[in-house]
């Protein structure tokens, strides 16, 4: 009886393993079909702003009406995929669904506007949008071709003290130049006036012309 019971237990384990193998085979066969049934599109190239912020739209198309969707942003570098951020949201609530310091997102129907913050020049690479239709079944998954995000490092701002020194030097130069021009102009005006007058007033006695003669009146008496 003990041997019979062992055979029955072995038979049950064998049946369970076969069932699990069939389920795994079924998922492997139909997963590519589910992936092809969900098409994900995203822009090819995006240039990040000077503050390290990049935004792009991840849009998916599927005949399956899902109410629960999961969106994941992956970064591909050297043939390796790294998860940047991910969040599951419901389609009915078209609100901000990713609350993270790195990523934010707003869903609107089958479109998701993703924004990645805090990027630097080292973060330049291919960012792939992965969409999963979680509920109701069946499960669908799709990945976009990727968005190449270029991050240009902003030029460092010059030192404010250095700018103040430059401004002070320019102001001093202009002041000295204007002072020099004024001094030269005044000296030229004084030189022009010096031959005409000495600048000292002297009272001179009146002079009589030499040609003027004095005539004495002559009276003729009449008897």
Swiss-Prot record:
Residue positions, PTM Phosphotyrosine: 201
Protein name: Cytotoxic T-lymphocyte protein 4
Ranges where the record places region Homodimerization: 46-50, 150-155
Residue ranges annotated as Cytoplasmic topological domain: 183-223
Matches recorded under Gene3D superfamilies: Immunoglobulins
Residues annotated as domain Ig-like V-type: 36-145
Spans within the Extracellular topological domain: 38-161
Region of interest called Important for interaction with CD80 and CD86, as start-end residue ranges on this chain: 134-139
Protein species of origin: Oryctolagus cuniculus (Rabbit)
SUPFAM superfamilies per record: Immunoglobulin
Cellular component, GO, one term: plasma membrane
